[in-house]
Swiss-Prot record:
One family name in Pfam for this protein: Na_H_antiport_1
Protein name: Na(+)/H(+) antiporter NhaA
GO cellular component: plasma membrane
Location of the protein in the cell: Cell membrane
């Protein structure tokens, strides 16, 4: 009788369904390539911005193109942040819709943990950043509180795919689910806290256009000659409203049907994810990561600024503490429990991995410090440095855990009698 309550305890990081794991496996392959391209683009931007030819980088980044009459005469870097990232957020919107309709987030009991972990992983780094800048007496920097709250799924999954050859699949699924919730919360933060001027006319027009787009796809319309112009008009109106234009991408993604006769979420995601991960996000990274460091002395000077060490502390300390502590508290004080095949060190490695912030963190940095170039550059340096440190710490922890699971796997696949069946699945001769 004493063991009975344990059967009702929900396992944290329990095994997902086979179709869900197949989908995640395909997603891992795409995001791994995207993460590699993201890294290459960021490194290329850093090298160019700190080379004798850095003026060329600035000229390309600041080159203005677009129709002035429509107030779309934007710099190349602004087109990358406002335009190309809308593709990324459209894919995020489709992924969110799918998770809430047929994925792990459709079950409130399963969704509670990643949602709570994501919230904890956003609150703690924000509190650390605010605390650091308050103590330093730089209240003018408080607008950057949201910079360290985001997790870059492409980078995180790329690191996990490289080092985690034998880690339990449930860890990867949990990271993906947490990152999806993280993206949703980051989108809400951008829409609510980084909208400076709101024009209700264009906003209403954008929402009506999105509704027409949604009605079309719900009715089975698939022709890009209709859907693409509607999406562009919705994006332009959202941009004119003062709300960040990428929010239009998310809302358009939410309208894509997941179930039913006209379901096309999987098909659209399959077609657009390579464009997002392979082009849109790397191009954004190229124009967002190019910051003139000024050598070791310049780097050391940047590290002395509260924006820099506030963001780094938020990513390297705040993110892991928030994710790990929330998960532990739920396991300790609710009916949730850690899966018997996992150790808390696995969760620690995952929590450290969540500290890799890049795409959304850089975007929030641009929005928070668009009128403060020095603070903006400090934020860029901090995001890059903090993400690298978090990735390295996660790699150390997860590599050690991967070695443990590799030894377990090797022991479980021993076939001493060469009969094609591992010995662990055969009865012992002395029984």
């Amino acid at each position: 009788m004493t063991d009975q309550p344990e059967t009702f305890r929900r396992r944290i990081f329990s095994r997902s369904s086979w179709p869900e794991w197949q989908r995640v496996s395909e997603l891992l392959r795409t995001e791994t390539v995207g993460g590699a391209l993201l890294l290459v683009a960021a490194l290329a931007a850093l090298v160019w911005a700190n080379s004798p030819w850095s003026a060329g980088y600035d000229q390309v980044s600041d080159f203005v193109v677009g129709p002035h009459s429509l107030h779309l005469d934007l710099s190349i870097s602004a087109w990358a942040a406002d335009g190309l990232l809308a593709i990324f957020f459209f894919v995020v919107g489709v992924e969110l819709k799918r998770e809430f309709v047929v994925g792990d987030l459709r079950d409130p009991a399963k969704a509670a943990l990643p949602i709570a972990a994501a919230v904890g992983g956003m609150i703690v780094p924000a509190v650390i950043f605010v605390g650091v800048n308050l103590v330093a007496g730089h209240t003018e920097n408080l607008g950057g509180w949201a910079i360290p709250v985001a997790t870059d799924i492409a980078f995180a999954l790329a690191v996990l795919a490289v080092i985690a050859t034998h880690l339990p699949s449930a860890l990867r699924i949990f990271l993906l689910t947490l990152a999806v919730v993280d993206d949703l919360l980051a989108i809400i933060v951008i829409a609510v806290f980084y909208t400076t001027q709101l024009s209700f006319g264009p906003l209403a027009g954008a929402l009506v256009t999105i509704a027409v787009f949604g009605l079309a796809v719900q009715r089975g319309v698939r022709t890009p000659f209709l859907l693409l112009p509607l999406a562009v008009v919705a994006w332009a109106l959202m941009h004119a409203s003062g709300v960040h234009a990428t929010v239009a991408g998310v809302l358009l993604g939410f309208t894509i049907p997941v179930l039913g006769r006209h379901a096309c979420a999987d098909r659209m995601e399959h077609r657009l994810r390579p464009l997002s991960a392979g082009f849109a996000v790397p191009v954004f990274a190229f124009f967002a990561a190019g910051v003139t460091v000024g050598g070791l002395s310049g780097f050391a000077s940047a590290l002395s600024h509260p924006v820099t060490y506030g963001v780094i502390a938020g990513l390297v300390l705040g993110k892991p503490i928030g994710v790990f502590l929330t998960t532990y508290v739920l396991a300790r004080f609710t009916n949730a429990s850690l899966d018997e095949d996992l150790a808390w060190r696995d969760v620690l490695g995952l929590a450290l991995l969540a500290g890799i912030g890049f795409t959304v963190s850089l975007l929030i940095g641009e929005l928070a410090f668009e009128n403060s170039p020095i603070a903006h550059d400090d934020a860029k340096i901090a995001v890059l440095t903090g993400s690298v440190l978090a990735g390295l710490l996660a790699a150390v922890v997860l590599l050690s855990r991967n070695a443990v699971y590799r030894r377990i796997h090797e022991a479980e696949t021993v076939d001493a009698d060469d009969d094609g069946v591992p010995d662990i699945y055969q009865p012992r001769q002395d029984q």
